[in-house]
From Swiss-Prot:
The gene is Slc16a12. The chain crosses the membrane at residues 10-30, 58-78, 86-106, 115-135, 148-168, 177-197, 253-273, 289-309, 320-340, 353-373, 383-403, 410-430. This is Monocarboxylate transporter 12. It is a multi-pass membrane protein. The keyword Transmembrane applies. GO terms for biological process: creatine transmembrane transport; creatinine metabolic process. It comes from the Eukaryota. Belongs to the major facilitator superfamily. Monocarboxylate porter (TC 2.A.1.13) family. Keywords: Cell membrane, Membrane, Transmembrane, Transmembrane helix. Interacts with isoform 2 of BSG; this interaction is required for its localization to the plasma membrane. One of its GO terms (molecular function) is uniporter activity.
Length: 486
């Protein structure tokens, strides 16, 4: 039998060095997510140089995104076993190596391996540990801190999109990749800022501590090859996994995970095909790149303002609803996109989509933290971003196949829009069902009285016991209001 004791090692400071952690995470999102978005600017160059179609070229962006999310649990494991600092520095070296090797590629397959697999693996070691570190330093102002940290994706896109286009024009796509390889080395600097912190947490402490101590001594004294040592090792591993990934059995987390699959499928293709779509409807190269910049700027506004708003007292308990609202509106934007075929119409689209994209991206770690708690946040975020992997991998090629097959972007954009709307509806429906179940207040009844039946609408209970009794007995005097049925 065990009892839970609170071991207060440190509380989230909600400031201090935490703001340096926010700055480090801000730079990590620039070097990972913003750079990943800007890879789509290379697509026209890749198609021309390698003479390939949309679906083949789109695999590069898909593999980068897929590896970043697929290996997110690996990033959590490395940061937990070694340190967040070591994991991010190692990831920066791998990502830079991928860009540099990609600049010497002679085929798309070389880009798949270097720019796709190697760079994506490096980004995975950096992204989820940096985001989880922000959650450990902030509690009361968590949404605002995440809003600032995640705004690096939008700011980086705004700055890097025209810069990358200029680099391609001046130094060709090979020179641009080489320069980006040097740029992402800044991830090593970001890793140096991630000072670890120990939070207060619940720990299960046995009432008879001498039993555990005796077991530990037996394990230490046993031979390394004895069955007792093997049993102790297996027990420690099982306990570690149960403590680290116990949230996987939570129903709320399972529903969130399923919803994330559809949301991730819908959100990725726009950053791949916005520039090619704009070019296909007659927008110039610089205007198409500027659309990505607008998307990035408004993404920043969505990150910060939604983070600040959901930290207010009036909305703090409705972060879940705000997340659903943002995802659904991005889906509606997708449905309208095929009707927007001029630059003046694509500008407000970029503003609207960018704002709500920044909004729900900010709230993903906040909603996850509310479900699993701060202690398991790093592992939970690793799983959440891992679930982005397959949708990120398949959605751009599927969209490219639809473009090649139908000759237009309409089917691809509609499919993405409906996927995001379904993601929002699924979470909302499950939340409503759970809320309805909670409002059904149980009332104690006597098993010996079969006539006593209670109906409830969540607030008022109605009894027909007296009416049933009156049928069997003589008419009773007028009952007082509020009489005791028992």
């Amino acid at each position: 039998m065990t009892k839970i004791t609170r071991v207060s090692l440190a509380s989230p400071p909600d400031g201090g060095w935490g703001w340096m952690i926010v700055a480090g995470c801000f730079l990590v999102t620039i070097c990972t997510r913003a750079v990943t978005r800007c890879i789509s600017i290379f697509f026209v160059e890749f198609q021309t140089y390698f003479a390939q179609d949309y679906s083949q070229t789109a695999w590069i962006h898909s593999i980068v995104d897929c590896m970043t999310m697929l290996c997110a649990p690996l990033g959590s494991v490395v940061s937990n076993q070694l340190s967040c600092q070591a994991g991010i520095m190692l990831g920066g070296l791998l990502a830079s190596t991928g860009f540099i090797l990609g600049s010497f590629a002679t085929s798309l397959k070389h880009l798949y391996l270097s720019l796709g697999v190697l760079t994506g693996l490096g980004f995975a070691l950096c992204y989820s540990p940096a985001i989880a570190m922000v959650g450990k330093y902030f509690s009361r102002r968590k949404a605002l801190a995440y809003g600032i940290a995640m705004s690096g994706s939008g700011i980086g896109t705004f700055i890097l999109a025209p810069v990358v286009q200029l680099l391609i024009e001046q130094f060709s796509w090979r020179g641009a990749l080489l320069i980006l390889g040097g740029f992402v080395l800044n991830l090593c600097v970001c890793g140096a800022l991630m000072r670890p912190i120990t939070l207060k947490e619940d720990r299960s402490v046995p009432e008879k501590n001498h039993n555990r101590e005796s077991q530990r001594e037996d394990c230490k004294q046993a031979s390394p090859y004895s069955p007792l040592t093997k049993e102790c090792t297996e027990t420690r591993l099982c306990c570690s996994l149960q403590q680290e990934y116990g949230f996987l059995l939570m129903s709320d987390f399972v529903v969130l995970a399923v919803s994330v699959l559809f949301m991730a499928y819908g959100c990725s293709p726009l950053f791949v095909y916005l520039v090619p779509y704009a070019l296909s409807v007659g927008v110039s190269h610089h205007q198409a790149a500027f659309l990505m910049s607008i998307l990035g700027v408004i993404d920043i506004v969505g990150n910060i303002t939604f983070g600040w708003l959901t930290d207010r007292r009036c909305l703090k308990n409705y972060r879940y609803v705000c997340y659903l609202f943002a995802v659904a509106l991005d889906g509606l934007c997708y449905l309208c996109l095929p009707m927007l075929q001029t630059f003046p119409l694509l500008v407000p689209f970029s503003c609207t989509f960018g704002y709500f994209d920044g909004a729900y991206v900010t709230l993903i770690p906040v909603v996850t933290a509310e479900i699993v708690g701060t202690t398991s946040l790093s592992s939970a975020l690793g799983v959440v971003y891992f679930l982005h992997a397959v949708p990120y991998l398949v959605s751009p090629p599927i969209a490219g196949w639809l473009v090649d097959t139908t000759g237009s972007y309409t089917a691809a954009f509609l499919l993405c829009g409906f996927a995001m709307i379904f993601s929002s509806i699924l979470l909302g429906f499950v939340r409503i069902v759970k809320r309805m179940k909670r409002t059904q207040v149980p009332f104690p009844v006597k098993d010996s009285d079969p006539k006593l039946q209670l109906w409830t609408n969540g607030s008022v209970a109605y009894s027909v016991a007296r009416e049933l009794d009156q049928k069997d007995e003589e008419p009773l005097p007028k009952a007082r209001s509020g009489c005791n049925l028992t």
